Design a protein with these regions (language model features):
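A generic local structural motif
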Residues: 20-22, 47-48, 66, 130-131
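Charged, gly/pro-rich active-site loop segments
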Residues: 1-16, 88-170
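Short beta-strand segments
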Residues: 31-65, 71-73, 79-83, 91-95
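A generic structural signal for alpha-helix starts
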Residues: 67-68, 103
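Short, intrinsically disordered, mixed-charge
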Residues: 74-79, 110, 114
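Generic structural signal for secondary-structure transition and capping sites
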Residues: 29-33, 78, 117, 150
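Short secondary-structure boundary/capping segments
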Residues: 26, 51, 71, 133-135
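Short, conserved active-site entrance elements at the starts or edges of catalytic domains
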Residues: 8-41
Length: 170
């Protein structure tokens, strides 16, 4: 992993990736909604709230096939997920892929159930009696974003700030 301190002009130390990872893996309920940024076919940006879950070094989210975000990802899989976690804001760039293997779908269905939404896995996607209105009608596809680059900014009160970019090995 390549790391660059974006706050060295202020004499601040770089943020270790372990700090971001600790926030991602804490299991604390999020008070802020993660947002997914995609690109429309004409190049205009699109941003939508998603229920993102960090699992095994990757971010997962769901979306209905007919939604703008899913249609955008079908044309251009590059995307960004931004989130505010305890003590750190993160922006994670990566490439989204639709997940179809049953083992991963079952594992992530359990992770979502642990957070209060218990989808069933049916025909390579999630189903349930409800989801976020922006997800479109069921079934909902599961997507995985493998991080390529991430940016972190410390937000904890009472400590010096910091900003760091991390580039991950492909």
């Amino acid at each position: 992993m390549d790391q660059k301190n974006l706050a060295d002009l202020y004499g601040l130390d770089p943020i270790p990736w372990s700090r971001a990872l600790e926030a991602l893996e804490s299991g604390e309920p999020r008070t802020q909604t993660p947002f997914l940024a995609t690109t429309r076919p004409d190049g205009r940006p699109h941003v939508a709230a998603v229920g993102a879950i960090w699992d095994d070094g990757k971010l997962y989210f769901t979306s209905g096939a007919g939604t703008r975000k899913s249609r955008n990802l079908a044309q251009n899989a590059n995307c960004v997920i931004s989130m505010s976690l305890t003590g750190i804001d993160l922006v994670v760039e990566g490439i989204a892929e639709r997940v179809t293997d049953d083992r991963t779908l079952q594992r992530l269905a359990k992770r979502y159930a642990d957070q209060g939404w218990a989808p069933a896995v049916t025909d390579g996607a999630f189903t349930h009696e409800y989801s976020a209105p922006s997800a479109g009608p069921p079934p909902w596809d599961l997507y995985v974003v493998t991080p390529t680059t991430a940016f972190g900014v410390l937000t904890a009160q009472g400590e010096p700030g910091g900003a760091t970019r991390w580039r991950f090995d492909a």
